[in-house]
């Protein structure tokens, strides 16, 4: 169960309450939610926050089935996920999704009535849809903010748009696209996608290079190749192989994440390459901000 027992009073005044929803279809939605949560906690003493996986809360079994399917398609058949992504803009798939979220919203309403937030922040369109449906039917009356964790405005974000108070988008073109889709300009804010404060820190370049055994006189490439999306396994390996064999005076930090099979493939490529001593292979790491600070290309 999520910890929902919050202090109602602190230092004589009532705490504002913010619910931050995400969904586990890729790590970006949670990363954005965590970044927002950290910022609020560090800057607003009178605001209490809670982060919740909306799909896991409303139906754990459905969440497990759909996230597993998502990950498998992303790894083994990214074209299939691409098809779903585009067909869910409009038509039967879009209707099925929005109808399902309306049904699931009833369970989410239990949480909202218990917590009584002053503001709902959503980093996934499913949560935005559920909350906007509840607001439309007068089950909730708090403000709703959609943090669009995409670089293009998928129509799933716009279901129930009349009941969503704020849209935070990655760039100006997205704002223009939303205006073209009848979202009022005063609701749209160009902020970029939320990032951890760690990415704003200034690191000592020499210290970081030494920490990871990197050379000062070589260009550094930070290569991500183990995630759920991207080029797919064969193209990822082809790109890394080209970097290893066709370029001079570079060093590579190749991050395979939690994908152990990809890590082994990286190691095999490195062993057979022209520069095995100039590639560092890493699994999941929380040192990405530091590595990015010394990288010439990501």
Task: Label each region the model flagged.
Residues 15-18:
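Extreme N-terminal starter segment of soluble prokaryotic enzymes
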Residues 23-32, 231:
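A short, glycine/small-residue-rich beta-strand->loop->alpha-helix junction that serves as a flexible
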Residues 35-111:
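Conserved N-terminal ligand/cofactor-binding loop architecture of enzyme catalytic domains
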Residues 297-298:
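Hydrophobic acceptor-binding patch used for acceptor engagement in glycosyltransferases
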